[in-house]
Amino acid sequence: MDIQQFRGKSVDDLKAHLIELRKEQFSMRMQVAMGQFQKTHEIRRVRRNIARVKYLLSWINRTPA
C-alpha cells in the first residue's frame, strides 16, 4: 500500500493493520527458514509497510489534536 492509503485510516485501523502485517512477516520468515518461500521481494514489501504504519502512528501521537 501507498502511504496515502494509510493516511485515510483511523488509529485503530492502523494498529489492526500493523498486527496483520507482523503476522504476515512472521509467516514469511518461517517459510523462508523451511525453504518453502520463493518470493523474497514480498518480505521487503511487508517490512516497508510495517515501517510506514509505525511512522504514521508515531506522527499521529506526536502532533497535537
UniProtKB/Swiss-Prot annotation:
UniProt key word Ribosomal protein = yes
**Record-annotated disulphide pairs:** none
Q: What is this protein called?
A: Large ribosomal subunit protein uL29
Annotated Gene Ontology cellular components are: cytosolic large ribosomal subunit
Q: Which gene encodes it?
A: rpmC
* UniProt family annotation: Belongs to the universal ribosomal protein uL29 family.
Q: Which UniProt keywords apply?
A: Ribonucleoprotein, Ribosomal protein
**What organism does the UniProt record list as the source?**
Xylella fastidiosa (strain Temecula1 / ATCC 700964)
- Tell me the Pfam families matching this sequence: Ribosomal_L29
A GO BP entry is: translation
From the UniProt record, which GO molecular function terms apply? Answer: structural constituent of ribosome
Show the Gene3D superfamilies listed in the entry: 1.10.287.310
Domain of life, source organism = Bacteria
Q: Does the keyword Ubl conjugation apply?
A: no
